[in-house]
Design a protein with these regions (language model features):
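Adenosine-nucleotide cofactor-binding segment
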Residues: 22-54
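A short alpha->loop->secondary-structure connector
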Residues: 1-7
Length: 172
């Protein structure tokens, strides 16, 4: 089913999704990180986010590490979708990492961000089976549906106040 949610805005650090987002009458803002420190970029990003006062912030295709000040400003409100079954294959190119290891399952993880890369409290995960015939690209294509499902389920839990965070774990 559909999520009962209002997307207040999409904020990216590249302008490449503007046209797509604006087709849905959703405001798009580009807050470039070029020439800025992580702290400077985080401050500009937070200022733009705060204009909308969202309940939650979703990181999807946002491939930048956010600074501790940004993380502290939005505790347990920033949800990241990572395209692996964490804690396996942290960081960039997890499908390539999975392919190189010859895994038999791939997955996706939605988690709250913290100051450690891809190590925040896990909200939702799911996996699918793969085999030796899958290339890294085939894994990536197969994983897209898993990522969408995991993110939507995590958002549904968050929006219905069904997540309790204790230490670095969640109870849902």
């Amino acid at each position: 089913g559909a999520l009962d949610v209002e997307i207040a805005a999409v904020i990216g650090n590249h302008d490449n999704l503007r046209e797509l987002v604006e087709r849905f009458d959703i405001p798009f803002h580009c807050v470039s990180h070029e020439g800025l420190t992580r702290v400077e970029h985080g401050k500009l990003l937070a200022e733009k986010i705060d204009e909308y006062a969202p309940d939650y912030i979703v990181l999807a295709k946002y491939m930048r590490v956010l600074n501790p000040e940004f993380v502290a400003r939005y505790p347990n409100r920033v949800i990241n979708i990572h395209h692996s079954f964490l804690p396996a294959f942290i960081g960039a190119k997890p499908y390539q990492q999975a392919y190189e290891r010859g895994v038999k399952i791939i997955g996706a993880t939605a988690h709250f961000i913290n100051n450690e890369l891809d190590q925040g409290p896990i909200i939702m995960q799911n996996v699918i089976n793969v085999d030796h015939t899958y290339s890294a690209d085939a894994m990536m294509r197969a994983g897209r549906d898993v990522e969408k499902t995991v993110l939507s389920r995590a958002l549904d839990l968050a929006l219905h106040d069904r997540i309790f965070v204790y230490k670095n774990k969640t109870v849902v």
